[in-house]
Design a protein with these regions (language model features):
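Structural motif
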Residues: 21, 60, 67-69, 76, ...
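Short, conserved beta-strand element in jelly-roll/cupin
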Residues: 39-43, 53-71, 108
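Hydrophobic small-molecule pocket/channel-lining residues, especially in calycin-type beta-barrels
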Residues: 54-55, 68, 84, 94, ...
Length: 147
């Protein structure tokens, strides 16, 4: 493992899904799988992930721009710039853009989850969007359960 510097607009991998762009700044392969970090852009009105629980990792959001809605165990929250949300392992949640402008946030998974997003990207590259059942099957492969 070596020190890495990733500048604004740069990333190790770029994935898209549900109209969102995910630019990974840190990947599992770079630090033994301890965590992954992405800069995620959410379009207004974009599709939210189905409510789910990460059974194998915690997830955290730091909002850079815009307004993000986060539902945690049925409680709706709105988080603006410089706001932070920690979703502990096993906690039901979903999130999306709550504003009329694009939202940007940093998303951290510990341990890393970048392999899941690579799979999600592949599902969304097809001619038609994946079915909710296809997304749930992928989620289950990575220790994510419906909430």
């Amino acid at each position: 493992m070596s020190t890495r510097v990733v500048q604004r607009g740069e990333g190790e991998r770029r994935y898209t899904a549900r109209g969102s762009v995910m630019l990974f700044k840190a990947l599992a392969e770079q630090d033994g799988g301890d965590f992954s970090l992405m800069e995620r852009t959410l379009p207004p009105g974009g599709r939210r992930p189905p409510p789910h629980r990460h059974m194998n990792c915690s997830e955290a959001y730091f909002v850079l721009d815009g307004l993000v809605s986060v539902t945690v165990e049925g409680e709706d929250l709105e988080v603006g710039p410089e706001g932070f949300v920690l979703v502990p392992r096993g906690t039901g949640h979903t999130f999306g853009n709550a504003g009329e402008q694009e939202a940007r946030l940093l998303v951290i998974h510990a341990p890393a989850m970048d392999a899941y997003f690579a799979g999600l990207h592949e599902l969304w590259l097809r001619d038609k969007p994946p079915t909710p059942d296809e997304e749930r099957q992928l989620m289950a492969r990575f220790g994510m359960n419906p909430a």
